[in-house]
């Protein structure tokens, strides 16, 4: 199964991605995690990405596309994957579509976690406090919401018109939301 999980920052994508990936026996591939690993390890890519993420901006498409393609080419993604944090704009949608077409593949579904923006801000501030994430301060959160709204929300319409968007209410206990996701995906396939 080839899946995307989308939602504004703090919607619970990362929280749900691991369980969804395990359920469908595919790797969960998070661009944010890949970037944070590079930052933590002090790689050249990590240094570039840190400055961009600290400002609340999105990493340039060329960097993101290259990292995602490299990861999708690994053996464990041959029979499916769950992408979290990619694509985030139409250029990335086109890059992913081209990759899938070139490999004779298609997306099965795009999960959209829907959560009220005010609740998202509260979640992110709490997460920043618990995890010490420097990319989650109030000003950066507001900027990330704006960037998400302007660049990523139009993708939902693209996937809706392709008939593969699966909207899911992202508010509630983690297990509740997870069961909604499984039910929505199972009814789609």
UniProtKB/Swiss-Prot annotation:
Subcellular location: Cytoplasm
Residue ranges of the region described as NMP: 30-59
Record flagged with keyword Nucleotide-binding: yes
Stated role: Catalyzes the reversible transfer of the terminal phosphate group between ATP and AMP. Plays an important role in cellular energy homeostasis and in adenine nucleotide metabolism.
NCBIfam families (alphabetical): PRK00279.1-3, PRK14527.1, PRK14528.1, PRK14531.1, PRK14532.1
GO biological process: AMP salvage
Binding residues annotated for AMP, in chain numbering: 31, 36, 57-59, 85-88, 92, 133, 144
Region (LID): 126-136
Substrates-to-products reaction catalysed: AMP + ATP = 2 ADP
Domain of life: Bacteria
GO cellular component: cytoplasm
UniProt-recorded name of the protein: Adenylate kinase
Subunit structure and binding partners: Monomer.
EC annotation from Swiss-Prot or TrEMBL: 2.7.4.3
Binding-site residues, ATP: 10-15, 127, 172
């Amino acid at each position: 199964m080839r899946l995307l999980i989308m939602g504004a920052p703090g919607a619970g994508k990362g929280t749900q991605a691991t369980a969804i990936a395990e359920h469908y026996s595919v790797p969960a591939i998070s661009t944010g995690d890949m970037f944070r690993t590079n930052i933590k390890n002090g790689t050249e890519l990590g240094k570039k990405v840190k400055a961009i993420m600290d400002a609340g901006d999105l990493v340039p498409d060329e960097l993101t596309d290259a990292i995602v393609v490299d990861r999708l080419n690994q053996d464990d993604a041959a029979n499916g994957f769950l992408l979290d944090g990619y694509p985030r704009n139409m250029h990335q949608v086109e890059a992913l579509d081209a990759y899938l077409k070139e490999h004779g593949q298609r997306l099965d579904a795009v999960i959209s976690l829907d959560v009220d923006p005010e609740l998202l801000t509260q979640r992110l501030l709490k997460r920043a406090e618990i995890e010490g994430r420097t990319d989650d301060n109030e000003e950066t959160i507001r900027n990330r919401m704006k960037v998400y709204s302007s660049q990523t929300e139009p993708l939902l319409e693209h996937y809706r018109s392709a008939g593969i968007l699966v909207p899911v209410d992202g508010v509630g206990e983690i297990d509740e939301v997870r069961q909604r996701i499984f039910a929505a995906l199972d009814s789609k396939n």
